[in-house]
Amino acid sequence: MPRVKRGVTARARHKKVLDQAKGYRGRRSKVYRIAKQAVMRAGQYAYRDRRNKKRVFRALWITRINAASREHGLTYSVFMNGLKRASIELDRKVLADMAVMDKPAFAAIVNQVKANIAA
């Protein structure tokens, strides 16, 4: 079997990792061994936070809906229960956007919910 010299593949692998570590501080962007660890850790953080982002945004939407519904005299839980009873199938993302951007439309929904709760 012929001898395999791995300089080309090693350099390519090192270059790939160092390119991913571009912008990191100090030796984290210059030294392969340290850059490799930094890139691995960055990947772990990215993986974790892609999942965490969903939780954070849902909490933000709930906070916004709660604030807007309290302006109309309803708590979040009563408002959401009223939506279910009124068969209004809007998700929290859309409701939160309405509460911030389109107050009259949100007020109309709140009025429908209030009518449904009273009945």
Curated annotation (Swiss-Prot):
Q: Which domain of life is it from?
A: Bacteria
Family, similarity comment: Belongs to the bacterial ribosomal protein bL20 family.
What GO molecular functions are on record for this protein?
rRNA binding; structural constituent of ribosome
A single Pfam family it belongs to is Ribosomal_L20
* Record protein name field: Large ribosomal subunit protein bL20
Protein role: Binds directly to 23S ribosomal RNA and is necessary for the in vitro assembly process of the 50S ribosomal subunit. It is not involved in the protein synthesizing functions of that subunit.
Which PROSITE patterns does the annotation name?
Answer: RIBOSOMAL_L20
Which GO terms of the cellular component aspect does the record hold?
Answer: ribonucleoprotein complex; ribosome
The taxonomic lineage of its organism, from the top, reads: Bacteria, Pseudomonadati, Pseudomonadota, Betaproteobacteria, Burkholderiales
Sorted alphabetically, which keywords does the UniProt record give? Ribonucleoprotein, Ribosomal protein, RNA-binding, rRNA-binding
Q: Which organism is it from?
A: Janthinobacterium sp. (strain Marseille)
Question: Can you supply a Gene Ontology BP term from the record?
Answer: ribosomal large subunit assembly
By which gene is this protein encoded?
A: rplT
